[in-house]
Amino acid sequence: MKVILLKDIKSVGKKGEVINVSDGYARNFLFPRKLAEEANNSNMRVLNLKKDAERKQKLQETEEAQKLANELKGKVLKLSAKAGENGRLFGAITSKDIAAEIKKQFNVDIDKKKVNSETIRKLGNYEIELKLYPEISTKINVLISEG
């Protein structure tokens, strides 16, 4: 019997896959636990519509991330921080601070998890990678000055 999986099932398949299983397994295990539904014409049509919508959504997100990457590429982010002797900062500049400053200076909202940097503890110029989408990233320069 062909079924459409509604959830990931170990050693069977992933959500959204159409697989062939025995009738007993489908009726006695998958259907009662709402892990799968029968792969009839109407359910297949709904599945195809969902997959098309997901594809369009992913394409749109990729385009937006690429546009954002082009917008931020090569920009210089200027931060000022208090520093002691030898240029060591009092405290540190984290990815959260960088994300907040990008929002403030460029009016672009970026999640702190997308800022790929270690904590900055000295004055200077740093190149930081922003991972905007799984395959799209860009680099910006961060200039830390005493202020």
Swiss-Prot record:
Any one of the GO CC terms: ribonucleoprotein complex
Keyword Ribosomal protein attached: yes
One MF annotation (Gene Ontology) recorded for this entry: rRNA binding
Key words, A-Z: Ribonucleoprotein, Ribosomal protein, RNA-binding, rRNA-binding
UniProt keyword Thylakoid present: no
GO term, biological process aspect, one: translation
Stored NCBIfam families: L9
Function according to Swiss-Prot or TrEMBL: Binds to the 23S rRNA.
Family (UniProt): Belongs to the bacterial ribosomal protein bL9 family.
Annotated protein name in UniProt: Large ribosomal subunit protein bL9
Primary gene name: rplI
